[in-house]
């Protein structure tokens, strides 16, 4: 399922997962992807996206593990695949890569992360 990518590319309340720390981290991910989109040749922006993503996924998976969330194995696999993808990238980023990252985050939050709302 594909969800509409907001324009401008900013986090809004429609992405709220109801855990303040994760909502803040999701906001940071939106900002990192937007920065990469605006500065496609900026290797530091891409490195920051990788770091923020890895840190967020670790926090989210820790919360899932603490509550024995049944979707953790699938969620971990999805996270691992995305991290591998963004770690393989190098600047400058092309249009397709930027579009992929924007769409992936939107779909992931609304289609995957929403499954844990109220369960962590």
From Swiss-Prot:
Task: Give the matching SUPFAM superfamilies.
Answer: Hemerythrin-like (SSF47188)
In UniProt terms, what function does this protein have?
A: Myohemerythrin is an oxygen-binding protein found in the retractor muscles of certain worms. The oxygen-binding site contains two iron atoms.
**Signal peptide (from-to):** none
Which UniProt keywords are given for this protein, alphabetically ordered?
Iron, Metal-binding, Muscle protein, Oxygen transport, Transport
Extract the GO molecular function terms from the UniProt entry.
Answer: iron ion binding; oxygen carrier activity
Protein name in the entry: Myohemerythrin
Query: Per its UniProt record, what Pfam families does this chain match?
Result: Hemerythrin (PF01814)
Keyword Transport in annotation: yes
Family, per the entry?
Belongs to the hemerythrin family.
The residues the record assigns to binding Fe cation 1 are 26, 56, 60, 113
Where on this chain does Fe cation 2 bind? 60, 75, 79, 108, 113
Q: Does the keyword Transport apply?
A: yes
């Amino acid at each position: 399922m594909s969800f509409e990518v907001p324009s401008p590319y900013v986090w809004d309340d429609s992405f709220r997962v109801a855990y303040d720390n994760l909502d803040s981290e999701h906001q940071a991910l939106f900002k990192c992807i937007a920065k990469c989109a605006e500065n496609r040749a900026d290797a530091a922006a891409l490195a920051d996206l990788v770091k923020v993503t890895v840190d967020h996924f670790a926090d989210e998976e820790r919360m899932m593990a603490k509550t024995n969330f049944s979707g953790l194995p699938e969620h971990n696999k999805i996270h691992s695949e995305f991290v591998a993808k963004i770690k393989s990238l190098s600047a400058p980023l092309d249009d397709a890569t930027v579009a992929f990252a924007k769409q992936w985050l939107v779909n992931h939050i609304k289609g995957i992360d929403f499954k844990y709302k109220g369960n962590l």
